[in-house]
Amino acid sequence: KVVEQTGGDLTKPNLAANLGEELGITINDTAGKNRTGGDYTRTAINNLKWADPKTLPNNPEDPNELGSEVHNFSRLWTGAFYDVFTGIVNENRAAGMDAAQALREASNEGLRMLGRLVKGAPRFDFTYKDMAKAFIASDRDGNEGKHVDLITQSYKNRGILPADFSLSEVGPSPVPRSLTDEQAAVQKD
């Protein structure tokens, strides 16, 4: 369905990008108006940039404006991750995959990336910048850095990482490097 809607160009509105919006509409339609706390438009296709939540309105009416309310503010991270996901799809297309295969492979890669990030995520009190650094570390240490440049640039573009951010600021990931098939076979013996 996403390929049908976009022809492989994930910057166009599509089911996957608008999943949060559709869920909010469904909940509000079923459970009553404003049940979710607002008419959240949580499309992943956005151009939101980092701002200190203390300086933001709670939940602005303009969907292109970032708000401090947690669901509203989360659109910043969602958009940044979607930028990475779109970049992977584009890389796959450039490598010769058709739109459906590129999307399928990027979806699988995205799930693996999120899994590594969750395992290596900072605990307790952390910032979006801390999470972005953990995302970079998890890819560098668990995926041979395949998407480090893409992740770094996406999070810089969103202001989550500063423009002068250096990879030397990223510490080791607590997630162990993935085993190769040969290493896994040796460990089984």
Model-derived features with residue positions:
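Zinc-dependent metallohydrolase catalytic domains
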Residues: 1-189
